[in-house]
């Protein structure tokens, strides 16, 4: 039995849920999200709560049970409060700028890296070495953050690169003579 899947999702005030078989549409003060689920699960609305139940007793249904519940919970949280990620850029001369709908990264390469900003994500740059990402879709926000980090992942010797704000980078000692 899934420990995550069996928990009901309480729908807060100001959030509307629309169910159409396995398609879930959730709208709230921050925006609207929809997702179609596959698999052997049933999504049921009971009073002010959403309940996800498996339809079969096989491994696929059990694994989708908890996953679907977590995705729906993140959708409800996203349209109500939104999600924020903070990225840190470490390195001499490393910086970020927003120009139009592109994020321009200067990361000690022969060229500047341009990344198109998705329409549902907002970027704020309080400093040149800090990137604040905001959005209602947790999955898309994480994917976009990983695209940014891939441009210059943190290296273990000097700690240069782009990383999540509170992520610890294991440092290595350099070569000895």
UniProtKB/Swiss-Prot annotation:
Entry annotated with the keyword RNA-binding? yes
> Keywords, A to Z?
Ribonucleoprotein, Ribosomal protein, RNA-binding, rRNA-binding
Query: What is the recorded function of this protein according to its Swiss-Prot or TrEMBL entry?
Result: This protein binds to the 23S rRNA, and is important in its secondary structure. It is located near the subunit interface in the base of the L7/L12 stalk, and near the tRNA binding site of the peptidyltransferase center.
Complexes and interactors = Part of the 50S ribosomal subunit.
One GO term in the molecular function aspect is: structural constituent of ribosome
Query: Could you tell me which PANTHER family the record lists for this protein?
Result: 60S/50S RIBOSOMAL PROTEIN L6/L9, LARGE RIBOSOMAL SUBUNIT PROTEIN UL6M
Q: By its UniProt entry, which Pfam families does this protein fall under?
A: Ribosomal_L6
Biological process according to GO:
cytoplasmic translation
Q: What NCBIfam families does the database record attribute to this sequence?
A: L6_bact
Write out the similarity annotation: Belongs to the universal ribosomal protein uL6 family.
- What protein is this chain from? Large ribosomal subunit protein uL6
Q: Which domain of life is it from?
A: Bacteria
